[in-house]
């Protein structure tokens, strides 16, 4: 009886119902297609010719080679309808409605984000390599570099959460949250209690969360529940029963802005596993950062872009009310440069991946990574191996206990090639590494939400911080070195697998860019 109740509860979940309806659409599409092609061999031949033409078209596109390979394999396996399938869901057309909403907001935000030419000039004179990276980010991501900014690094979700709660209790004007995952429990309920109290004090509280990220954790009407408490809420890109790849484009960002003076980002979401109140995959190794000073202004603008793109007209925020000059100055001068940046799937500029590649190519002594997933294209693989062959100390820390076992099989499929090329890979013994960051040569680091995998690099909305020559860089390095003490290094002999296992990994790796 208990099993039956659990089974019925599972069947009643929204994701199950919506997925089933999409499955029915696919079956109807396949059935109708086979029926049409059965009428005439000429129709069948026409669709096969279409598939050949689509393969030629894909070969001449400027897409990532791994993505092109995945689609070509699909079309070759199913030549009858593979070409039509690509034309239906393979291009960028499904995200056109996201582009229409977001691009005007990004353009409006750009009017308020101005780079300081003095910073660029100073960097050119003393560090041309870093100057070029900052130039790239300012022009491709649209967010400027700042001095007079401070970043505090927290090597665990528990540490970051405590400071988040403290800062939230100090809020006087507004609290803006944009997160991929929210789940009821100790962490979120603590935050929600503070938010409710702040609403009563007249603070403007707004929450934006991703629908797929929360689909197992929150009821479908949770946004209404928050609105009844006085919290304005948007659910990003709802999962609805329509067959489309638009649902691949998720809001994976983690942004908390308080009064325009303090901001947080990093790897942690609002769920108990991120602060180790619930352990499903051993110890959850994550991180977070607090930003103060002028760089908070860019974090505010990131939230404004996404919020105004999807809010009702009456709930939209006025860009003119947010000024860089209003950001609370630091108590003392901080050294170094902080550049918050974002990445989105609305164009062919993959900022997150380019930041990582630029760091790898510029590394002289070492480059270290935290990443929960390692599913990368040939450009990143080549950059990592070439860096190792140049004598750079390249180290990557991945989970010892993964949160997604099938994805981890794909991650492990890269080990052999990288290890043979001189890259050192380590698995974290106590549990799951969920932090996403890199540190290079004691002077540059990047930290945020961007995993080394296809979804983060090509499909999701993401955000990060580029840090140069400030104390946080060394804090990140220390965290990675401390974590290495609890890791097992992957040796060449450990990469040898049986033929069946290698075949499975190879198949998963081919289709990874399409998942």
Regions found by a protein language model. Give the residues of each.
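N-terminal localization/anchoring segments of enzymes in phospholipid and broader phosphate metabolism
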Residues: 1-354, 358, 362, 402, ...
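Glycine- and other small-residue-rich loops at beta-strand/loop junctions that grip anionic moieties
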Residues: 180, 372-373, 407
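Residues at alpha-helix boundaries and short interhelical turns
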Residues: 216, 371-374
